[in-house]
A protein has these predicted regions:
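Conserved beta-strand position repeated across blades of beta-propeller domains
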Residues: 32, 70, 126, 171, ...
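Short coil/turn segments that connect the beta-strands within blades of beta-propeller domains
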Residues: 35-36, 74-76, 130-131, 175-177, ...
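Mature N-terminal segment immediately following signal peptide/propeptide cleavage
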Residues: 23-51
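Sec-dependent N-terminal signal peptides
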Residues: 4-15
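Boundary at the C-terminal end of the N-terminal hydrophobic targeting segment
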Residues: 18-20
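A flexible loop/linker signature enriched in serine peptidases of the S9 family
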Residues: 42-47, 61-66, 79-91, 95, ...
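Glycine-rich phosphate/pyrophosphate-binding loop
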Residues: 312, 317-323
Length: 489
C-alpha cells in the first residue's frame, strides 16, 4: 500500500509539473467576466477559465471565428458573434457550454472581416437584460463607417433598433433608463493618437427625456463605456497610452485608474464585480472593490492544426511580376517569397525560401545580373540584392532604416538603387561602396515619384509643398544639389 501511495504521489507531482511548465497563452482576445468565470476568444474559438488562471476549457470549435463573448446579467448565458452558418451573426450559448443558438439573421456584407479596419458586422456589445442582447450592425447603413445599435431577443424574435442614429460600444445604467455609448466605432483602426473629427467621446442618452450629454469632452479617444453603480468606466489615450478611467455621475469627477505605458488596454468588458481586458496579449481583470488589476495566467492545450506546415499553391497568391531584361525569365512575389519562373521551359526556383520573413518588391537590375528586393529578416525593412540565379547568399545593402520602405528604382547602369520611405525621404545607395546619400526630405507629403536619367547622373522627383501642391526637382549626383524644374503655384 505504501508503494502504491508513493507511486500515486509521484504521478501527481509530474502531472502538476507538466501543467505548471505549460507555456502561458498569449494573444487572447475580447474577454468577458462574470464572478470567477472568464471567457475569451483564442485562435477564433471561445475558451473559458477561472479568473485565478489555469488550464482553459474550449467552448466552441466552428470553422469560422467566434468573438466578443458577453455574459448575461445573471451569468447563465454567453452571447457572442460567430460565423457558424457562413454569415456573421449573433449567437447564444449556455455559460458552461452547449449547442449555440442563432438569434439574428442579416444579409452578407462585402466588408465583414475581423481584419478589416471597419471590424466585423453584428458585434455583440452588451446585454440590456437577461432577455435582450445589444449588438452593433451595419445592416441598415450605406456607409461602412456607420452602424446602429439593435436589441436582439434571445428567443429569436425580430431585432429592434435602439433610438440612436449611430452607435458603438455601450453600457446601460443600473436602472436601464440611460445608455452610455460611443457614437463612432473605430476600435479596429491601426493608427494611434488620433484627435480628429472621428475621435470619440462617451455620451449618455436618457431614454425618457431623449437628451444626450457628453461626459468626457476630450480631444483624445474616450471609448468602451462600462456603467457600474454611479460610475462610468472607460478607456482613454489622453495620456498617450490607453488606460482605464472612471467618471462619477454624481460628482462628475474623472479619475485615471491604471498606468500602463507600454501596451494599450484593449477591448475591456464589464462583469458583475470586475472589468477584464487585454494588455500585451495577456488578460487582466480590474477588481471594482479594491480598484486593483490582476493578471489571469492562462494555459491552453490545443492541437493548433492551422499552424502546421502545409502545401500551398503559390500561383494563387502572386502579388507582383517582373520580366528579366532578356525576357527569358520572370520573378514573382508570392506568400512572402520570391520565385524565378522560365518564360517558356525550365526550372522554377524559390530564390529566398525563408520562413517568417516577408520579401517583396523584387525587380531585375537593368543588366540582368541581379535581383533586388525589400525584406524584413532583421526586423526592419531593408533592401537586398542577390544573384539572378540565386546561386549565392543575398547581400544586405541598407542597414537600420528604421521605417517602412515604399519601393525603389534601379539606376540604368545597375550601380545604384534609389528608394523612398515613410520618413518622407528620397535616398540612393552606391552598390559597390554601400554608401547611402540622402537626396531630399519633405516637410509635407511623401516623395514617392522619382525617375533616373538615362545616364544615371540625375534623379527627377516630385516634392509636395505644405499645401500638397507638387513641384518637379532635378538632383545632380555629381555635385549633390537639387534644383526645381517647375514653377511654384
Amino acid at each position: 500500500m505504501k508503494r502504491i501511495f508513493t507511486t500515486i504521489c509521484v504521478i501527481m507531482f509530474f502531472t502538476a509539473s507538466a501543467f505548471s511548465q505549460q507555456e502561458e497563452a498569449r494573444l487572447m482576445r475580447f474577454p468577458a467576466i462574470y464572478g470567477d468565470q472568464v471567457v475569451f476568444s483564442y485562435a477564433g474559438d471561445l475558451f473559458t477559465v477561472d479568473k485565478s488562471g489555469g488550464l482553459a476549457r474550449q467552448l466552441t470549435s466552428a470553422e469560422g471565428v467566434e468573438i466578443f463573448p458577453r455574459f448575461s446579467p445573471d451569468g447563465q448565458t454567453i452571447a457572442f458573434t460567430g460565423q457558424y452558418d457562413g454569415n456573421t451573426e449573433v449567437f447564444i450559448i449556455p455559460a458552461e457550454g452547449g449547442v449555440p443558438e442563432r438569434i439574428t439573421y442579416t444579409a452578407t456584407l462585402s466588408r465583414d472581416n475581423l481584419s478589416d479596419r471597419m471590424g466585423p458586422n453584428n458585434i455583440v456589445m452588451t446585454w440590456k437584460d437577461n432577455d435582450h442582447v445589444v449588438y452593433r450592425s451595419r445592416k441598415k447603413s450605406f456607409n461602412d463607417f456607420q452602424g446602429q445599435l439593435f436589441l436582439a431577443p434571445v428567443d429569436g424574435g425580430i431585432s429592434t433598433q435602439i433610438p440612436l442614429p449611430t452607435g458603438g460600444f455601450c453600457s446601460y445604467s443600473p436602472d436601464g433608463k440611460k445608455l452610455a455609448f460611443n457614437r463612432v466605432f473605430r476600435e479596429f483602426r491601426t493608427w494611434k493618437y488620433y484627435s480628429g473629427g472621428m475621435a470619440d467621446d462617451v455620451w449618455i442618452y436618457d431614454f425618457d427625456t431623449k437628451e444626450t450629454v457628453n461626459i468626457t469632452n476630450n480631444d483624445a479617444q474616450d471609448i468602451f463605456p462600462m456603467w457600474h453603480g454611479d460610475v462610468v468606466y472607460f478607456l482613454s489615450d489622453r495620456d498617450r497610452t490607453m488606460n482605464l478611467f472612471s467618471y462619477n455621475t454624481a460628482t462628475q469627477e474623472t479619475k485615471k485608474l491604471t498606468n500602463y505605458d507600454n501596451f494599450d488596454i484593449k477591448f475591456p468588458s464589464l462583469g458583475d464585480n470586475a472589468i477584464i481586458y487585454e494588455n500585451g496579449g495577456y488578460l487582466y481583470y480590474f477588481d471594482l472593490a479594491t480598484q486593483t488589476p490582476t493578471k489571469v495566467e492562462v494555459q491552453i492545450m490545443k492541437d493548433f492544426a492551422a499552424s502546421r506546415p502545409q502545401w500551398k499553391d503559390a500561383s494563387k497568391s502572386i502579388n507582383s511580376a517582373y520580366p528579366s531584361p532578356d525576357g527569358k525569365r520572370v520573378v514573382f512575389g508570392s506568400r512572402g517569397d520570391i520565385f524565378s519562373v522560365p518564360a517558356s521551359s525550365g526550372i522554377t526556383k524559390n530564390l529566398t525560401k525563408t520562413s517568417g520573413v516577408h520579401e517583396r518588391n523584387q525587380d531585375w537590375s537593368p543588366d540582368g545580373r541581379w535581383i533586388a528586393y525589400i525584406g524584413d529578416a532583421t526586423g526592419e525593412n531593408e533592401i537586398y540584392i542577390m544573384k539572378h540565379d540565386g546561386s549565392e547568399e543575398p547581400i544586405q545593402l541598407t542597414k537600420n532604416t528604421g521605417t517602412y520602405i515604399f519601393g525603389y528604382e534601379w539606376s540604368p547602369d545597375s550601380k545604384k538603387i534609389a528608394w523612398s520611405d515613410q520618413e518622407k525621404r528620397l535616398q540612393y545607395i552606391d552598390i559597390d561602396s554601400k554608401k547611402v546619400t540622402e537626396v531630399d526630405q519633405s516637410n509635407s507629403g511623401e516623395l514617392r515619384n522619382y525617375e533616373w536619367s538615362p545616364d544615371s547622373k540625375w534623379l527627377a522627383y516630385t516634392k509636395p509643398s505644405f499645401e500638397e501642391v507638387t513641384r518637379i526637382y532635378l538632383y545632380n549626383l555629381e555635385n549633390k544639389t537639387s534644383k526645381p524644374a517647375t514653377d511654384e503655384w
